[in-house]
């Protein structure tokens, strides 16, 4: 049933993108896509794959304090299988997080709550990295671009302000223990309620111990300055590689948009992923094309073609690779084939 829902969601996502392209001009957009320079487009694909590798490196780095965490081929297959769930499920950043944590825990000697804390922290670093890169891009464009950036500033203020407010609230909650106290209280009440039911085994301490492990892992990450610096650097670098496919995709269409502007548009477009479709399909394409039209003066059909190429070399390429790994894992199992993998 879950596979059917995922497939149905993907069909709807493709349909929404198709409606968007039709509204702009199907023939015009398709003509631009077909005329894209293949070598430059290959550069976009390479950058997109580099971004996927860095996202995995971020999770791997945050797993360092976890005893018995997945490593080597085991980590790679679990991470990519989880990334497939993240890509295939609506609101994948939220719904895919526990799936990835479960797979990382299942294929290792670590606990689910520890991996959940790591994956959630990685999503937080990615959010901060996107806002930092957008800020860098707008600073560079304002300094040397010489163009109007009113639309960019407005978009950055809305998206960045909301993102920073959310991130700040989470930091305050974690540092002051608000989230921990609330979670413990809720879990304790649940344990009491379940324990009062007849014919059910006692679960006293089960939920609270899990929550304690979750917050303990977050505290371990927070206590390591080296881990924080490394994770922040990887997150920003991954977003740089996430923006380059847009730059190369536009070059493949013969459009030379300032790189600084691309560094702003790519992160801001990710906020279009709020739509409840796999990978934010439809929303991201619309937001990205609109930003290119409003800020760079790119014609609507060319901007839409650029958005399509960008998504093909990032989201859909990642979806294909992680999906292939997920299928192989489901067919052949999760244990590494080579003994040397356990030493990686």
Residue ranges of model-derived segments:
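Transmembrane helix-loop-helix hairpins in multi-pass inner-membrane proteins
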Residues: 1-31, 85-192, 281-344
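Membrane-interface helix starts
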Residues: 3-5, 35-44, 220-232
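Helix-boundary and loop/linker segments of multi-pass membrane transporters
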Residues: 29-37, 68-71, 108, 217-224, ...
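Hydrophobic alpha-helical segments embedded in the membrane of multi-pass proteins
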Residues: 34, 74-80, 238-248, 258-273
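Transmembrane alpha-helix interface/packing and boundary motifs in multi-pass membrane proteins
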Residues: 47, 83-90, 250-252, 266-281, ...
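Membrane-embedded helical hairpins/re-entrant loop segments and their flanking transmembrane helices
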Residues: 54-81, 250-264
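Membrane interface segments of multi-pass transport proteins and intramembrane proteases
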Residues: 67, 172-215
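Alpha-helical transmembrane segments and their immediate interhelical loop/hinge regions
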Residues: 203-253, 259
